[in-house]
């Protein structure tokens, strides 16, 4: 029988750093949760593409925005900007960048294992 668990997202199991950003990864039960920190000037094109070597991000994301703003552009040209309090589902085939001069902080739900290639 499964037991209840309690963990703090402020004490991650692992931290992944890369140019202008980091992901704090926490596993609880069979779910991965991540807290993302992206600096102004971060973009998928400049900071992640060189690491994963694909034309766009091939992972899906479910995110909750804590602070800052981020814009996603799908391969088909569709774009959407997200800010504090927004929930976002982003399917594979996109690029993203931080909008403005404020850092972006968000919670990534359930898909953080995909970031182990970073």
Label each PLM-derived region with a short phrase.
Residues 43-44, 68-73, 96:
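Short beta-strand segments in beta-sandwich/barrel cores
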Residues 74-93:
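Short acidic-glycine-tyrosine-enriched beta hairpin
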Residues 35-56, 79:
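Conserved short histidine dyad/triad with adjacent acidic residue
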Residues 36-38, 63, 88:
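Conserved GNAT-family N-acetyltransferase fold
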Residues 1-37, 45:
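A short, N-terminal "cap"/entry segment at the start of jelly-roll beta-barrel domains
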Residues 54-72:
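Short, conserved beta-strand element in jelly-roll/cupin
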Residues 91-117:
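Ligand-binding loop in jelly-roll beta-barrel domains
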